[in-house]
Design a protein with these regions (language model features):
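Hydrophobic alpha-helical interface faces used for helix-helix packing
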Residues: 16-216
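Surface-exposed loop and adjacent secondary-structure segments within mature catalytic domains
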Residues: 1-19
Length: 216
């Protein structure tokens, strides 16, 4: 049997929103989450369907690759901490070396990006609009506490589908705020409300952050 359990990979990911969460947490600031714990419908998207992302394209992971987009880096500081929601996205940036190659440990071949289309855990079907498109992804280990970015093999950005059905190209240079910021909410991430901490990119990922931004 293959490392992906015989399942077909996927090159699309669903928007989980601008908050670093494990796959089994109930919360979501985006348009998708755990189906058995969370109900999101068009009426609940107060930011507007033309200003909120649903899906992004995503690179499928490549076995033994250390390249950003094709692999997920392992961050040892996440392993040492049990509540990663208070970790900044900049942790992933610190793991990238020359030529967009990860410098340390990477996830094993069974936990590659997009490796299983019917699996609702972070590496496979979610992205978090906290680092800009084509930024690095990192996590604790295996499928736990993985911060996945939107990614593509297009130069300069990614295509996203917004809730009104339009497809937009988003540049890697989009305003993504300050990656060193955190919600500061380690025990109650559901209390994270209001405008995104991660600029226009994060605002496009939040479904009810009350931001007045449009897709660039």
């Amino acid at each position: 049997m293959s490392q992906n359990g015989g399942k077909t990979p996927t090159s699309y990911k669903c928007n989980r929103g601008d908050m670093w969460l494990n796959w089994d947490w109930h919360e979501s600031r985006g348009t998708f989450g755990r189906g058995d714990k969370l109900l999101i419908n068009f009426a609940s998207v107060s930011d507007g369907t033309s200003n909120t992302m649903a899906v992004s394209e995503a690179i499928i992971g490549v076995q033994n690759s250390r390249r950003v987009g094709e692999a997920i880096a392992v961050d040892t500081s996440i392993i040492a901490d049990t509540i990663p929601p208070d970790h900044p996205p900049s942790l992933c940036l610190q793991l990238v070396g020359p030529n967009r190659q990860f410098t340390g440990t990477i996830q094993g071949p069974g936990s590659l990006p997009g490796w299983r289309w019917a699996d609702g855990r972070n590496p496979y079907t979610f992205f978090y609009p906290m680092l800009p498109p084509n930024g690095p992804s990192c996590g604790r280990s295996g499928e736990d506490w993985c911060l996945l970015t939107a990614s593509s093999r297009h130069p300069g950005g990614v295509n996203v589908l917004v809730l009104d059905g339009a497809v937009k190209f988003i540049s890697e240079t989009i305003d993504a705020g300050d990656p060193t910021r955190t919600t500061g909410l380690t025990s109650r991430p559901q209390d994270y409300s209001g405008p995104s901490l991660y600029g226009v990119w994060g605002a496009l990922g939040s479904a009810y952050g009350k931001e007045s931004v449009a897709v660039p």
